[in-house]
Each structure stands twice: as C-alpha cells, then as structure tokens.
C-alpha cells in the first residue's frame, strides 16, 4: 500500500480488525521508508444498485441524495444533522441488505417520509410536497389533514 506521506510503495500491516458493523477490515499500517503510520479499510466491492426514477430512467444509487433531500426539508428546523445521518444510515442499510440490484425512487421516498414523520412533521410535509409533487392545494391539504389525524391519534394513545 502506497504511503500517503512520502509516496513509498510498500508498507507493513501492524494491526487488523473488523469494524464495529463488521462490513470492512481496518488495517493499521507503517511505511517501510518514513516510518509514519496510517489506516486503511478493506471492503467487499459491491455491485451498484440502480434507482428506477419515475420516468423509468435508471441511475446509480447515491446515499448522499437521501441526506441532501432531508437536509433541505429540515432547513431552519431544530433537527440535528446527526439524526439525519442516522436516518440515512438506516435507510442505506435497508436498501443494501435487501440484496436487490434495483429499487424505485418511490420506495426510497416512502422510507424517508416514514422516518421524517417521526422526527419533524414540518420537515415531513416539506419533503412530501416535493417528493409527491402535489398537483394542487387540495391534495396538499389532504396530506396535512391525514398527518394531523395521525398526530391526534398518537396523543390520545399516549
């Protein structure tokens, strides 16, 4: 492994261990020339997952799009970025663990809305308004009424 400090092409492995989630191997290495230490990760190469868009185009799955969409929906809301990163991790694991090579953007959007609804209702409505592309104010109001009804039911059951 090439040293990131001096560029020497050889190093020795000092320590190897699995990461906490057991999806990769963390290796501590030492450069044979300059002696500096660095860390590398070894991971199984995954086949790309394709997202089937609403117009039937296909594009490579990008977990960052999920995070960016939620960040946009949560602008000026009291939702910590850490929460959004955790949601992104959960959705990402769910998609990867499904072992499917294709997933629809609709399925991903529904997963995001399911999570956002429990975190911040305003962010949920913002995300839903873009994702569901409401045709008019009435369909938007129907979604709000449904959300209010669910919210009231939760309060009654609490």
Swiss-Prot record:
MF annotations from Gene Ontology: ATP binding; DNA binding; zinc ion binding
InterPro entries to which the protein is assigned, alphabetical: ATP-cone_dom, NrdR-like_N, RNR_NrdR-like
One of the GO BP terms on file: negative regulation of DNA-templated transcription
UniProt cofactor note: Binds 1 zinc ion.
PROSITE patterns cross-referenced by the UniProt entry: ATP_CONE
Signal peptide extent: none
Zinc finger (unnamed): 3-34
Keyword Repressor: yes
Domain ATP-cone: 49-139
Pfam families per record: ATP-cone, Zn_ribbon_NrdR
Cofactor: Zn(2+)
Record has Nucleotide-binding as a keyword: yes
The entry's keywords: ATP-binding, DNA-binding, Metal-binding, Nucleotide-binding, Repressor, Transcription, Transcription regulation, Zinc, Zinc-finger
Function, as annotated: Negatively regulates transcription of bacterial ribonucleotide reductase nrd genes and operons by binding to NrdR-boxes.
Family under the similarity heading: Belongs to the NrdR family.
NCBIfam families: transcriptional regulator NrdR
Protein name per Swiss-Prot or TrEMBL: Transcriptional repressor NrdR
